[in-house]
Amino acid sequence: IYIAMNKNNVKITVVGLGYVGLPLTIEFSKHFSVIGFDLNIDRIKELKLGYDKTKELSKEQLLNNSNLTLVSDINEIKESNIYIITVPTPVNRNNIPNLNPLKTASEMVGAILKA
């Protein structure tokens, strides 16, 4: 990854724009072209308007960022060469994680990599 990140053609996609994914997206976008992807269309609309319901980021951080693209269409992340998946893995009362969101996101990214 280090070698790839030193190239000018780096395009990172962060899948899942929650408490982990959104701040990570903003940090990477300080140095690289980044696509923030989330299946929740309303979440993307809110972020594009500068509103973060998690209150992790300010309006300025979201709107004044030329390296950041926010999308909910999986086809818009095809050009990326680095994918980071940051989806929830909630635990049940026995502390067993539900890995279904991670499996689904991995399958989505995998389908793009195969195409």
Spell out what each predicted region is.
Residues 2-115:
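Structural/interface elements that position substrates and couple domains in central-metabolism enzymes
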